[in-house]
Every structure is written in structure tokens, then in C-alpha cells.
Amino acid sequence: MRTEDSTGVPFAVAGSVNGGRKFIMEEMKNIADIKLELTLKIEEDFGLNSIHIARIDGFFNIVHARAGAPYRSQHISLKDILSKTQKDFCFERLRGTLVCVYYPDYMDGINASGWHMHFVSEDKKLGGHVFEASFDSAECLLQKMDRIEIQLPREAAFDTYSLKEASQDEIEEVELGKG
């Protein structure tokens, strides 16, 4: 999705999928099945101590997603912002791409460990953070990432704000769409 160059984001993970392992994922009834299949593939080929990115293209039976509206504040948690601005969506029977990023357990704190997924429709008009999805068959491209770059905010407020207030339960609520 395109935005103005001046549009900011509070947090983003970006990567290129050039190469890697390509395979077909057959019937995935829910997001737990998708995460399990991806985890098995990285255990087979790479091991679980690296970051991985997957691009899954196909026709999705259902995608439950959410997106938070823009919100300007330096001292409100993601959970609190989402409780005020989040919109939930249920997309049915559409083509699109599921982008999945895996962080190993030891990187918890830089990002929530495990799989984090976003969806964008083929026409780039629909999308969001995914907490449920299913498809009959889709093509997956899975790649190990060998580096990360972290850009920290330049604002003074960042240096004085307590960043470790979120509990594991709160992070799970946000990730799974329960918050």
C-alpha cells in the first residue's frame, strides 16, 4: 500500500524475499496450521535460531485481520491505542499475499517471538495484521534472514519512556487480536 513519504509508522519489519525455498502449502484450515507448517519447514531446512520471512500467495477462503487508525501519542501503549482505534475485518474468498515474519525466542524484546503475519489483497486495497486465515492451496516462498537493522526514534521522548511495561499476556492479546 502506498502512502505519503511523510507518513510515519511506530514500528515496521521489512525484508526482501529473493530466493529461499519455494513450496506449495495444501489445505490450511486456520492460522495455527499455517504457523505449524512454516515452523516445520524452518526446522527442516534452517533451524529456529534465525529470523525467517515467508510470502504466501494464493486464494484465501477467509482472513480475519485488524488495523489501527493513525494515532499520535508518545506515552500510550499499543494495547491501549488498539482498544481505541482498532478496526477488525473479515475478508472472504479473495486473492492476496500473507507476509509472515518469524523471530526466535531469544530475540523476544526486540520483537514478539514466533510468527507475526500481515495480509494484503491482490489489488492492494485490503489488509492488516492477521489473527486468523485459511486457504485450500497456496504458494509459499520461505527465506532465512541473515541480518537485522534497527533504527531507533530520534525524539527525546524515546530516551525517557519506559518501554518494558507490556507483559507477555498483553503482547499475546495484541498479536492474537484479543485486546
Task: Locate predicted features.
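Long, positively charged binding patches that form subdomain-scale interaction surfaces
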Residues: M28, A32-I110
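Conserved catalytic alpha/beta cores of large enzymes that bind or transform nucleotide phosphates
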Residues: L163-G179
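Mature extracellular or lumenal effector domains of secreted proteins
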Residues: G96, K125-L126, V174-G177
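Histidine-centered divalent-metal-coordination microenvironment in nucleic-acid enzymes
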Residues: A112-V120
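A generic structural signal for well-ordered coil/turn residues at beta-strand boundaries
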Residues: S50, E92-L94, N111-S113, L126, ...
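Hydrophobic alpha-helical segments and helix pairs
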Residues: M1-I42
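Short, solvent-exposed amphipathic alpha-helical segments in soluble enzyme
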Residues: P70-R72, W115-H116, S134-F135
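A hydrophobic, small-residue-rich beta->alpha segment in the mid-to-C-terminal subdomain
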Residues: S121-A166
